[in-house]
UniProtKB/Swiss-Prot annotation:
Belongs to the MIP/aquaporin (TC 1.A.8) family. It is a multi-pass membrane protein. InterPro entries: Aquaporin-like, Aquaporin_transptr, MIP, MIP_CS. This is Aquaporin Z. It comes from Flavobacterium johnsoniae. The keyword Transmembrane applies. The chain crosses the membrane at residues 4-24, 33-53. Channel that permits osmotically driven movement of water in both directions. It is involved in the osmoregulation and in the maintenance of cell turgor during volume expansion in rapidly growing cells. It mediates rapid entry or exit of water in response to abrupt changes in osmolarity. Keywords: Cell membrane, Membrane, Transmembrane, Transmembrane helix, Transport. The record marks F42 as: Selectivity filter. The record marks C19 as: Involved in tetramerization or stability of the tetramer.
Length: 79
């Protein structure tokens, strides 16, 4: 359950920080956030979650990655 919560929180933070910055940049183009700012926001959200909960769950933060590893036999469903 601890791993599940860590992955859920990491995915939430990635969507909130990364996608939120993209929405913010599109909504206020005069601020000049641009592509580099959005890319930096995505990178920093992954970095913060990797340090915060990566040691607990492995830090996939993307259900597609977990599913792909499970389908390839490199990740058990109970993990």
């Amino acid at each position: 359950m601890k791993k599940l919560f860590a992955e859920f929180f990491g995915t939430y933070w990635l969507v909130f920080g990364g996608c939120g910055s993209a929405v913010f940049a599109a909504g206020y183009p005069t601020l000049g956030i641009g592509f580099a700012g959005v890319a930096l926001a995505f990178g920093l959200t992954v970095l913060t979650m990797a340090y915060a909960v990566g040691h607990i769950s492995g830090g996939h933060f993307n259900p597609a990655v977990s599913f792909g590893l499970w389908a390839g036999g490199r990740f058990s469903a109970k993990d």
